[in-house]
Swiss-Prot record:
Disulfide bonds: none
Gene Ontology annotations of biological process type: mycothiol biosynthetic process
Location of the region described as Disordered in the Swiss-Prot/TrEMBL record: 428-458
Metal-binding as UniProt keyword: yes
Protein name per the record: D-inositol 3-phosphate glycosyltransferase
Chain's gene name: mshA
Organism: Gordonia bronchialis (strain ATCC 25592 / DSM 43247 / BCRC 13721 / JCM 3198 / KCTC 3076 / NBRC 16047 / NCTC 10667) (Rhodococcus bronchialis)
Residues engaged in binding Mg(2+): 311-312, 314, 338
Catalytic activity: 1D-myo-inositol 3-phosphate + UDP-N-acetyl-alpha-D-glucosamine = 1D-myo-inositol 2-acetamido-2-deoxy-alpha-D-glucopyranoside 3-phosphate + UDP + H(+)
Subunit field text: Homodimer.
Lineage: Bacteria, Bacillati, Actinomycetota, Actinomycetes, Mycobacteriales
Chain positions recorded as UDP-N-acetyl-alpha-D-glucosamine binding sites: 22-23, 30, 236, 241, 302, 324, 332
Length: 458
């Protein structure tokens, strides 16, 4: 339980994607879910949350009361449509100006803490932290150096601009939140992060939405055959997530099972994103070329309640990603009692209990995935046992647990920041005793600026 100072109001920064967007297409994915779920649960603990995100439509209201104590501020920065995420660094000045102007319209000391999500937001948070005189907590969600070390075929490497930008944020943030111990180790080994400033805060799932249920009812609601063995991919369609690997690996099984009592079907749920936008029909073309187009079903991104039915309808959910800082899909599927076949990369080894709630595959070779799929589907009793274990495993990963750990990180950030800034220490003490929001604006300052060469870093 957190015993130190806690913020009254937090500015969450999510530049490139809104928590109100539908996950599974464009730039909306697990981070959207993370920001929304943690924001609403922080609000339930009495913390006011304001989320700054870039407006993507002229109809976006400047302020949206999204939930009790949760406000989304849509900041105009660049054109509403047609702006690729790779072009967003050029709009960070405009976005930062919008954030600073919003705060300037309030009384001094309006926000107690900034929590930035993804490196673009970290750049904004770094400047706002120095302007407002409050601590900055940063969650990377993904790291360029990690992604570039495990690129999928046909994927585009993250630019050096991002690597440098991430390095700056890692150096500047008061605390860094990593999804897993693996990500914490990557921050230390690849970015030279101070281990003492890292908190491991594991993401969760909405355990009230994602629950086990009758497979027959779920399949009926989705119009799926009751007799098929269904293997499902959920996520953005891009090389990093490797849905093509699943289709290629399943192809031999689909061909061999056509005349059996239990034919195999692949279900792809999501929309194109990132470099996947360059070839939006690539997966459809692949299924056609492999002669299995009739056994591959495509669905658009689904709302949570509908997505829960997708998980329940599946015999197995596949997460073949080349890189994954955690893997929310894996936890959501297991919460619904569905076992997971996942690549043994990043946080997936935490999200999936290999051999107990699913299977971890140690390579991205098509043959290895075909063998893993065949072995899993050939043992329905074993899959059923894994499904029962999966729900128990998933119950360790609630968003309430996530927010408990997040608030502890916030408290440490506020304490360490106050220790370095005597005026901040007095402000925190006054806040805890009186609940007063009266604080004088502190002058612009830089805590450190240590951009190091990207080679030869110790």
């Amino acid at each position: 339980m957190t015993t130190g100072p806690l913020p009254r109001r937090v500015a969450l920064i999510s530049v490139h994607t809104s928590p109100l967007a539908q996950p599974g297409t464009g730039d909306a994915g697990g981070m959207n879910v993370y920001v929304w779920q943690t924001a609403t649960r922080l609000a339930r603990r009495g913390v006011e949350v304001e989320i700054f995100t870039r407006a993507t439509s002229s109809s976006d209201a400047p302020r949206v009361a999204a939930a009790p104590r949760v406000t989304v501020r849509n900041v105009v920065a660049g054109p509403f449509e047609g702006l690729d995420k790779r072009d967003l660094p050029a709009q960070l000045c405009a976005f930062t100006a919008g954030v600073l102007r919003a705060e300037a319209a309030q009384e001094p000391g309006y926000y107690d803490l900034i929590h930035s999500h993804y490196w673009l937001s970290g750049q904004v948070g770094w400047l706002a932290r120095d302007r407002w005189g409050v601590p900055l907590v940063h969650t990377a969600h993904t790291l360029a150096a990690v992604k570039n070390a495990s690129l999928a075929a046909g994927d585009t490497a993250e630019p050096q601009l991002r690597v440098i930008g991430e390095q700056q944020v890692v150096d500047e943030a008061d605390r860094l939140i990593a999804n897993t111990e693996t990500e914490a180790s990557e921050l230390i080994s690849m970015y030279g992060a101070d281990p003492a400033r890292i908190d491991v805060v594991t993401p969760g799932a909405d355990l009230d939405c994602y629950t086990p249920g009758p497979r027959e009812m779920a399949r009926t609601s989705l119009g799926l055959d009751q007799n098929e063995a269904i293997v499902t991919f959920v996520g953005r369609i891009q090389p990093l997530k490797a849905p093509d690997l699943l289709i290629e690996a399943a192809a031999p099984l689909i061909r061999r099972s056509r005349t059996s009592r239990r034919p195999v079907r692949v279900l792809i749920v999501g929309g194109p994103s990132g470099s996947g936008l360059d070839r939006p029909t690539a997966l459809i073309d692949l299924a056609h070329d492999l002669g299995i187009a009739d056994a591959v079903t495509f669905l658009p991104p689904q709302a949570p309640a509908r997505l829960a039915d997708v998980y329940r309808a599946s015999n197995l959910v596949a997460v073949p990603s080349h890189s994954e800082s955690f893997g929310l899909v894996a936890i959501e599927a297991q919460a619904c009692g569905t076992p997971v076949l996942a690549a043994d990369v990043g946080g997936l080894s935490v999200a999936v209990a290999g051999g107990r709630t699913g299977v971890l595959v140690g390579s991205h070779a098509v043959g290895d995935w075909t063998n893993a799929l065949e072995k899993a589907l050939a043992q329905p009793d074993r899959l059923a046992e894994m499904g029962r274990n999966a729900r128990v495993h998933a119950e360790q990963f609630s968003w309430d647990h996530t927010v408990d750990a997040m608030l502890s990180s916030y408290s440490r950030a506020m304490q360490s920041f106050a220790a370095r800034n005597p005026d901040a220490a007095q402000s925190v003490a006054a806040q805890n005793v009186t609940g007063s929001s009266s604080r004088t604006r502190r002058p612009w300052r830089r805590r450190r600026s240590t951009l190091l060469p990207m080679t030869g870093r110790s």
